[in-house]
Structures are given as C-alpha cells and as structure tokens.
Amino acid sequence: MDKSLLLFVGVVVLGGAVLYWNAQNPAQPSAGHSMEVPDTSALAAGAPLADVAIPASFSAEAQMGQRAFEVKCATCHGTNAAGQNGVAPPLVHKTYEPNHHGDMAFVLAAKNGVQSHHWNFGNMPPVEGLTDADVKMIARYIRELQKANGIF
C-alpha cells in the first residue's frame, strides 16, 4: 500500500475518533461569571451600579491613573468606576476581570471606542487626549479597585 494512502487513512480514522469522542463527551459549562445584564430598573437614572470598596492605598501608578480616570472617564463610568445607571457600566465588575478584558482592551477601547456588547448603554466613543501610557495607568487604578472588591 502506498505510504501516502496509509497516512491519509490514518488521519481520517484519527479525526473520526476525535469527533466521536467529542460528541460523546460534550464540554461542560465553566463555573465562571454570568454575562447577563443585571436588572437596573429599580435604580434612579445616574445612580451608581456597584458599591465600590476603596483600598487603603493605591500604588503610585494607580494614583496617576485615578487622576486621569476622574478627568476622562468618571463623567460616564462614575466615581470610582461604579458605573451610572442609564449612562455607562461599572468597571469594578466581574465582566471586566483581567481574564475577560485584559489591560489592552482598555487601551483599545479608549483609542477606538467600543461597540456595545455586554450592556445596554450604547456604544462608547473613543476618548480624546489619552496616550496608551495614560490608559495603562487608568487600567492599573481599575485593577486595584477590582482587587479590593474581590473581582480577582
């Protein structure tokens, strides 16, 4: 038998075995967080969407990020990234944990804007006047808030 034909038959048989195995053993849902949007209908417009615990101290980078956040982000995302009902989501939320939205996601969001995909607030426009370094410091501030609030 030709070696190429033998190799082809082997690959087909192996592929079939993998497909059969996957059909018999479907992937189990992970025990991650819910991606369902919470019901905020009982909250007043502009009300914070999260109760944010503030850490005892921030790193120097997070302190600079906090100042930049307050100038460029808090108008929509609220004080301490708690979000605002009807305006923008809280960034101190499981949805934005590092395993789901890495720090680069914040850089890209600020640079390019974001099409609404987790929440019903509409699209986020690009943020003018921030460098990548500024956004990385903002991300550091958000990560330290998230850590203080048990997000990761």
What residue ranges belong to the model's regions?
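Hydrophobic membrane-insertion alpha-helices, especially the h-region
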Residues: 7-19
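Hydrophobic single-pass membrane-insertion segments
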Residues: 19-31
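Electrostatic cytochrome c docking/interface patches
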Residues: 33-68
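Positively charged n-region of N-terminal signal peptides that target proteins for export
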Residues: 1-4
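The canonical Cys-X-X-Cys-His
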Residues: 65, 69-79, 124, 138-142
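Stable alpha-helical elements in mature extracytoplasmic
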Residues: 61, 102, 106, 134-135
